[in-house]
């Protein structure tokens, strides 16, 4: 089992899909990484040898922010918005959608489960 950026890649998956288990790498980024190291997308993660894993690891460390650093970067961006007091920062602070969606009926993911009229007071 290959271990990259502190994450064990799943066995028996195509390598482009397996790389998406690393936080900060999506499918497009995974394919760009594989193009850089000249590997086919359809290669299974079981078939990776040590040298190939090291080449992938070097590309990721050089060009991408992943895992803990990425999470920290995102949380610092949100903290910066809230400190500025801009519209997006206020919406983050209130736990509401930031991108213009309506909130009268939907937005349950951000607002949490429904509360009855009695619990609201």
Curated annotation (Swiss-Prot):
One cellular component term (GO) for this entry is:
cytosol
Quick one: a GO biological-process term for this protein? translation
Recorded hits in Pfam families, A to Z, give:
Ribosomal_S13 (PF00416)
Keyword Ribosomal protein carried by entry: yes
Is Ribosomal protein a UniProt keyword of this protein? yes
Give the compositionally biased regions (Basic residues).
101-121
Q: Where is this region: Disordered?
A: 92-121
Which GO molecular function annotations are given, in alphabetical order? rRNA binding; structural constituent of ribosome; tRNA binding
- From the record, what ranges are coiled-coil? none
Q: Which UniProt keywords apply?
A: Ribonucleoprotein, Ribosomal protein, RNA-binding, rRNA-binding, tRNA-binding
Supply the InterPro entries for this chain.
Rbsml_uS13_C, Ribosomal_uS13, Ribosomal_uS13-like_H2TH, Ribosomal_uS13_bac-type, Ribosomal_uS13_CS
Q: Which PANTHER family match?
A: 30S RIBOSOMAL PROTEIN S13/40S RIBOSOMAL PROTEIN S18 (PTHR10871), SMALL RIBOSOMAL SUBUNIT PROTEIN US13M (PTHR10871:SF1)
Oligomeric and partner information: Part of the 30S ribosomal subunit. Forms a loose heterodimer with protein S19. Forms two bridges to the 50S subunit in the 70S ribosome.
What function does the entry list? Answer: Located at the top of the head of the 30S subunit, it contacts several helices of the 16S rRNA. In the 70S ribosome it contacts the 23S rRNA (bridge B1a) and protein L5 of the 50S subunit (bridge B1b), connecting the 2 subunits; these bridges are implicated in subunit movement. Contacts the tRNAs in the A and P-sites.
Q: Which HAMAP family match?
A: Ribosomal_uS13
NCBIfam families associated with the record? uS13_bact
Give the family, as the similarity comment puts it. Answer: Belongs to the universal ribosomal protein uS13 family.
Q: What is this protein called?
A: Small ribosomal subunit protein uS13
Underlying gene: rpsM
């Amino acid at each position: 089992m290959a271990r990259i950026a502190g994450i064990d890649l799943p066995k028996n998956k195509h390598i482009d899909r397996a790389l998406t288990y690393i936080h900060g790498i999506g499918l497009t980024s995974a394919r760009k990484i594989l193009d850089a190291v000249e590997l086919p997308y359809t290669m299974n993660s079981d078939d990776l040898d040590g040298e190939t894993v090291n080449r992938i690891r070097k590309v990721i460390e050089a060009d991408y922010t992943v895992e803990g650093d990425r999470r920290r970067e995102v949380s610092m961006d949100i903290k910066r918005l809230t400190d500025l007091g801009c519209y997006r920062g206020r919406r983050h602070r209130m736990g509401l959608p930031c991108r213009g969606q309506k909130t009268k009926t939907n937005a349950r993911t951000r607002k949490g489960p429904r509360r009855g009229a009695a619990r609201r007071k």
